[in-house]
From Swiss-Prot:
Monomer and homodimer. Part of the essential Sec protein translocation apparatus which comprises SecA, SecYEG and auxiliary proteins SecDF-YajC and YidC. Its cofactor is Zn(2+). It comes from Erwinia tasmaniensis (strain DSM 17950 / CFBP 7177 / CIP 109463 / NCPPB 4357 / Et1/99). This is Protein translocase subunit SecA. It is found in: Cell inner membrane; Cytoplasm. Residues 841-850 have a biased composition (Basic and acidic residues).
Length: 901
């Protein structure tokens, strides 16, 4: 109550920010008459003037009024469109490292031209980020004329472009592309073997369109570049045969492990667990199928991967449904985005889940992959010097934007008042009662010529509604992942009088629904339309537009509530654009997933008390409040999952940044001989110390072991025992110096044969390849650590702190291994002629290019860790008894962790 009172007196933070910015808007409006008088050449010259002022030290913010006035005037001349005052406000918010919430139809694309132009003046680059390639190309082409009029260059970053074309796109003042492609280019740049292979500049300013979709919905989705791991498709097929024999536990009680069935399902967490009976049943079935030997256990050390396959197969059968979570097209399992309803070509679930679904559907099983490089969108976008975003629905996620990305959300007022009527939810007892009511509502409204948009949350539900409409004789269009090719066309005509469009999660974001249909689309369909034809089309559209307004505007029907209020708001936001009339209503049933899992008992009891009869609907503020609370519960849980994922990924991110920084420094220098000499001395010292401890007596020396190690690992054959016999007074320090001198001389002989320049190139290549190889193994080890770290909680230890501590120790050990491997490789390598070295380098480059193309987006669903399937650890060098312990202690393996083995 007190907060509301204070807000009323002083205004909210949002109000105060807009009040401050309105002063700048007034300033821009005062400048407008002066800018109108400028010739085209004088207006274009403003860009040169602004850049000169920035070079002299003027702040970017000081240019806002003049720069925005320049863009507004240029837009009027190029597009015939003038930025509204609210769009100027939006532009300032976006320049101010904030998120601008702008309603559908308020012109976000035109608003983005303001901060994009301003920040491009610095010459450091602007990245406009969109959710798909179509929008990236569309927005770039639509705005190209404006930016080129003002003297700025435009680049489009698309998948599959060759490196020179990508480099050119990134060198442009403003680059358009998708979040995936920007992220992949960052990872590829950090796998490059020469500075010329890199394409990105330093990350300066990112302007993210549909920011909620990219920074919230995609936050659990790591970007991964991967290579093939071992083939285990036969095992997936065998395990898949077992699952149909298992029985689901009927009652999900607290002690699910002791239950009657073979497995229990937790729908809230989307997890499935074997019961004690289930474990026994699975073991018996695996023995009968010949997968396991008689008497073996699933939890035997050798069968750990079996358990991984069983869990993946169970989840595939129980939690993932065809035409809801994925579709099967041309013998391929393609994931359906739960937030947009679009198919996600090229994405694969991790942890063997995708292979398990492929086995379930009987299609070809693709190999599991091993991660070579990965990053989450959360950590990628935080690399930018300046980040901003815009969307129609951000206010419900304002806390998350603030806490994770340090971005404030500012709600921009609409240019015209919103007059859409949002009707209360109607709740029915059963699914069929609800669908019957929806069909009746559609028939009544279309009879009056009112267009209707029906939003469903899955392809399966959209097809059920479509079948019922067909049965009722109602003509309609269906827009879901199966028919996405006609998306823009269907959405553009969804505002025709009496039109009925069924859309899955409103997949048509980016295309406005215009009341009366799109006259631009009609004109575009004609070849060389005459002026008379254009006038006739516009006149016909005006009649249709007025008829739709008279019928009440576009009516939105939601067939059930989504887990997130934001997705519901996106659906509602399709109606009532630019002050148009419209209405919306959600129809729910007690059989809906959200109601069944999160709100069932309370609402069902409430409905019984209110005396519900079959076919009747309840419309009550209590029910609406209960549903809103259920959505908040889910949103809160999903936020916790994303936050926890980020906390763990932050640990890996610190290490990633250190490795990539070191790698880039290495790429940018041509001579690493000093570094090699330093680590060679360090490695030899550590090796000698493990056999001849400093300040020790000669009886403690393991001379034979040292000779063997130097010969095996460094190709350095030295008669150390003979030296000690010939020189009984040979001091420990003198012996060390002699060994180091022999190693140095051996290395110089190799350098003389191959040539100094070729040796420098070879040293650099070995360092890069060894670093990449060990980093890949380190990523796998980090994933394994992450998967089991929660068990530390049972020992009263904080899993996050344990993860930080152990991952740091692993990182330190990796750096020690890096030094050892580099020196060992350079010492043992057989010297070849320069031509052979160049040929090997070319083969290496071709192989790295092939691997870089094997990229995938590992889609991690809300309930699984962001851990990838990384089984390939067999290439690891076996640690000898006299080798330095991998923990980095400096002791022999047999005297350190070897004892534990």
């Amino acid at each position: 109550m007190l907060i509301k009172l204070l807000t009323k007196v002083f205004g909210s933070s949002n109000d105060r920010t807009l009040r401050r910015m309105r002063k700048a808007v007034e300033q821009i409006n005062k400048m407008e008459p002066d800018f109108v008088k400028l010739s085209d050449d004088e207006l274009k010259a403003k860009t040169i003037e602004f850049r000169a002022r920035l070079e002299k030290g003027e702040e970017l913010e000081a240019l806002i009024p003049e720069a925005f006035a320049t863009v507004r005037e240029a837009s009027k001349r190029v597009f015939g469109m003038r930025h509204f005052d609210v769009q100027l406000l939006g532009g300032m918010v976006l320049n101010d490292r904030c998120i601008a919430e702008m309603r559908t139809g308020e012109g976000k694309t035109l608003t983005a031209t303001l901060p994009a132009y301003l920040n491009a003046l610095s010459g450091k680059g602007v990245h406009v980020v969109t959710v798909n390639d179509y929008l990236a190309q569309r927005d770039a082409e639509n705005n190209r004329a404006l930016f080129e009029f003002l003297g700025l260059s435009i680049g489009i970053n698309l998948p599959g472009l060759p490196a020179p074309a990508k480099r050119e796109a990134y060198a442009a003042d403003i680059t358009y592309g998708t979040n995936n492609e920007y992220g992949f280019d960052y990872l590829r740049d950090n796998m490059a073997f020469s500075p010329e292979e890199r394409v990105q500049r330093k990350l300066n300013y990112a302007l993210v369109d549909e920011v909620d979709s990219i920074l919230i919905d995609e936050a659990r989705t790591p970007l991964i570049i991967s290579g093939p791991a071992e083939d285990s498709s036969e095992l997936y097929i065998k395990v898949n045969k077992i699952i149909p024999n298992l029985i689901r536990q009927e009652k999900e009680d607290s002690d699910s492990f002791q239950g009657e069935g073979h497995f229990s399902v937790d729908e809230k967490a989307r997890q499935v667990h074997l019961t004690e009976r289930g474990l026994v049943a699975v073991e018996e079935l695996m023995v009968s199928e010949g997968i396991m030997a008689e008497g073996e256990s699933l939890y035997s050390p050798g069968n750990i991967m079996m358990m991984h396959h069983v869990t993946a197969a169970l989840r595939a059968h129980v939690l993932f449904t065809r035409d809801v979570d994925y579709i099967v097209k041309d013998g391929e399992v393609i994931i359906v985005d739960e937030h947009t309803g679009r198919t996600m070509q090229g994405r694969r679930w991790s942890d063997g889940l995708h292979q398990a679904v492929e086995a379930k559907e009987g299609v070809d099983i693709q190999n599991e992959n091993q991660t070579l490089a990965s990053i989450t969108f959360q950590n990628y976008f935080r690399l930018y010097n300046k980040l901003a975003g815009m969307t129609g629905t951000a206010d419900t996620e304002a806390f998350e934007f603030s806490s994770i990305y340090k971005l404030d959300t500012i709600v921009i007022p609409t240019n015209r008042p919103m007059v859409r009527k949002d009707l209360p939810d109607l709740v029915y007892m059963t699914e069929m009662e609800k669908i019957g009511a929806i069909i009746e509502d559609i028939r009544e409204r279309t009879a009056n010529g009112q267009p209707v948009l029906v939003g469903t949350i899955s392809i399966e539900k959209s097809e059920v509604v479509s079948q019922e409409l067909t049965r009722a004789g109602v003509k309609h269009e269906v827009l879901n992942a199966k028919f996405h090719a006609r998306e823009a066309d269907i959405v553009s005509q969804a505002g025709q009088p009496g039109a009925v469009t069924i859309a899955t999660n409103m997949a048509g974001r980016g295309t406005d629904i215009v009341l009366g249909g799109s006259w631009q689309a009609e004109i575009a369909a004609l070849e060389d339309a005459s002026a008379e034809q254009i006038d006739a089309i516009k006149a016909a559209w005006k009649i249709r537009h007025d008829a739709v307004l008279a019928s009440g505007g576009l009516h939105i029907i939601g067939t059930e509530r989504h887990e997130s209020r934001r997705i519901d708001n996106q659906l509602r936001g399709r109606s009532g654009r630019q002050g148009d009339h419209g209405s919306s209503r959600f129809y729910l049933s007690m059989e809906d997933a959200l109601m069944r899992i999160f709100a069932s008992d309370r609402v069902t009891n409430m409905m019984r008390k209110l005396g519900m009869k079959p076919g009747e609907a309840i419309e009550h503020p209590w029910v609406t409040k209960a549903i809103a609370n259920a959505q908040r519960k889910v949103e809160s849980r999903n936020f916790d999952i994303r936050k926890q994922l980020l906390e763990y990924d932050d640990v890996a991110n610190d290490q990633r940044r250190a490795i990539y920084s070191q790698r880039n420094e290495l790429l940018d220098v041509s001579d690493v001989s000093e570094t090699i000499a330093s680590i060679r001395e360090d490695v030899y010292k550590t090796t000698i110390d493990s056999y001849i401890p400093p300040q020790s007596m000669e009886e403690m020396w393991d001379v034979a072991g040292l000779q063997e190690r130097l010969s095996n690992d460094f190709d350095l054959t030295l008669p150390i025992a003979d030296w000690l016999v010939a020189e009984p007074n040979l001091h420990e320090e003198t012996l060390r110096e002699r060994i180091m001198q022999q190693a140095q001389e051996q290395y110089q002989r190799k350098e003389e044969v191959v040539g100094v320049e070729m040796m420098r190139s070879f040293e650099k290549g070995v360092m890069l390849q060894t670093l990449d190889s060990l980093w890949k193994e380190h990523l796998a080890a980090m994933d394994y650590l992450r998967q089991g770290i929660h068990l530390r909680g049972y020992a009263q230890k904080d899993p996050k702190q344990e993860y930080k501590r152990e991952s740091f120790a692993m990182f330190a050990a990796m750096l020690e291994s890096l030094k050892y491997e580099v020196v060992s490789t350079l010492s043992k390598v057989q010297v070849r002629m320069p031509e052979e070295v160049e040929q090997m380098e070319e083969q290496r480059r071709q192989e790295s290019e092939r691997l870089a193309q094997q990229q995938q987006l590992s889609h991690v669903d809300a309930e699984t860790e962001a851990a990838q399937s990384l089984a390939e650890q067999s290439g690891e060098r076996k640690v000898g008894r006299n080798d330095p312990c991998p923990c980095g202690s400096g002791k022999k393996y047999k005297q350190c962790h070897g004892r534990l083995a």
